[in-house]
Amino acid sequence: MTRSLAVQGGSPVRTRPWPLWPQPAPGAVRALDGVLTSGRWSISGPYRGAASQERRFAQAFAAYNGVEHCVPAASGTASLMLAMEACGIGAGDEVIVPGLSWVASGSTVLGVNAVPVFCDVDPDTLCLDPAAVESALTERTKAIVVVHLYSAVAAMDALRALADRHGLPLLEDCAQAHGAEYRGVKVGALATAGTFSMQHSKVLTSGEGGAVITRDAEFARRVEHLRADGRCLAGQPVGDGQMELVETGELMGSNRCVSEFQAALLVEQLGVLDEQNERRRRNAALLDKLLADEGYRPQTTSEGTSTRTYYTYAARLPEGELTHVDAAAVGEALTAELGFPVAPCYAPITRNRLYDPRSRGRFALGVQHESRIDPKRFELPVCEEAARRTVTVHHAALLGDESDMHDIATAFGKVVRHGALLTG
């Protein structure tokens, strides 16, 4: 093998293609064709004598997660906002969120006129640190949002106990954890409600989409109203050609519904989710061993995790190695070796260029409010260290075979051994 790195003009470890994502389920095309000719393309379309695809997916996803209620929504972002609004969160309320996550963890709180309070994470799981949450609570705290990040499930025993002790709703952001379990219970079913994203990159995808799940019938009814312009599904059968949404006037909402095309696709993709998750899990276990041999520290999950899933495979750089460069430079080198993106983990939301409340006039609600939502007021040392020293691989690579995992490990080892050549 050449001593020079591919990023500097050397030969890469691999030139063969990697698995593509998304991968359509066997019945996906047939399901989409069925919607196309059904005469109903949305939940607000007329009843045609059969259950809507939206209802079919809602029932299937609720059953899959072991809960009574699922309300599909337009996106993971919409789902988070719906869940927060269903909790009654609004102007001036504080919501605890992790500092290490996609920017939606903060922007959704702003979107309901509340104040995101960013907390540090556990250095091994990269999920919300219960001790940091405890320290951040104030009389204005109205909810805690926990994100199951990358491939880890958060410390739900401690977080649930904390939320219960303070009488706070606990919301699970499961956008990256479809199918994961904690003490035998699916994530999303462990707290007040769980929210999901079905965006293009997710392990269960319809391109865009989301869902809120809960065991609470009244909570689900509020979510239904909030996502369908104040309307909810009829509690009894309607006649052919009639709309299934009823205008109750109970709660004003907006349109955050999925289309019948998205719902039909999700019904089919749900059928292959467990099989795909198992393949990722098997390959990730091999990769854990291979990368540990090279000195990397793969992300761990909380004690109590009974089924782990992988949206992203994350690993910390070897101790004492590559200290002269950041994870972005290492990711660029690994990308050149492997031919697919290897990226640093999320930047802390507080300094993410995509999170800037000052850029939106809607958040200019006075000096006091603007001071409270200023992300610069938070210090997140664990988030900062993770961003500097952690690289990530998208789950599509984990749908390969064992030889693919060996290629990944070879590239990771090569970059460590020749890391002195890197700059940046």
Curated annotation (Swiss-Prot):
Cofactor needs: pyridoxal 5'-phosphate
Pfam families for the chain: DegT_DnrJ_EryC1
Keywords, ordered alphabetically: Aminotransferase, Antibiotic biosynthesis, Pyridoxal phosphate, Transferase
Any one of the GO BP annotations: polysaccharide biosynthetic process
Keyword Transport carried by entry: no
PTM sites of type N6-(pyridoxal phosphate)lysine: 202
InterPro entries, per the entry: DegT/StrS_aminotransferase (IPR000653), PyrdxlP-dep_Trfase (IPR015424), PyrdxlP-dep_Trfase_major (IPR015421), PyrdxlP-dep_Trfase_small (IPR015422)
Enzyme class name: transferase
Job of this protein: Catalyzes the PLP-dependent transamination of 2-deoxy-scyllo-inosose (2-DOI) to form 2-deoxy-scyllo-inosamine (2-DOIA) using L-glutamine as the amino donor. Also catalyzes the transamination of 3-amino-2,3-dideoxy-scyllo-inosose (keto-2-DOIA) into 2-deoxystreptamine (2-DOS).
Family: Belongs to the DegT/DnrJ/EryC1 family. L-glutamine:2-deoxy-scyllo-inosose/scyllo-inosose aminotransferase subfamily.
Protein name: L-glutamine:2-deoxy-scyllo-inosose aminotransferase
